Amino acid sequence: MATTLLEYFNELRNQNPFSWVKDSEITAVEPGHAEMTLQTNDTEYCNFRGDLHGAVCIGLADSVMGTACFTLGKSVSTIDLNGNYVKAVKGGTVLRGVANVEHNGKTTMVATARIYNELGELVHLARG
């Protein structure tokens, strides 16, 4: 049983049915904010060119934004999601996702996420 908020969120993440989350970890949570890392590899996460498939960054962004929303005590479903790919990423890269809740309304929420590579370079921007 979790004894900290961070442990609790990682226990919830482990119950996620998407297989890629096995390589992810929630590294920080506070009200309206969450951070995650994802260890990628070149066999499960890449397209035929060896670049990360687009679904990886947007999936990480969706997960970290949902976690940020959940820190405010709300269970959410994504109703709109967009992302901008800023830089190509090769398999084997550790990605870091940082999300913040921008709008905490009665019936909707809006969050933003930034995904960084190991060098701290921005590789993806998302809003949902």
Where does each model-flagged region fall?
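Terminal targeting signals and extreme-terminal segments of soluble enzymes
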Residues: 1-128
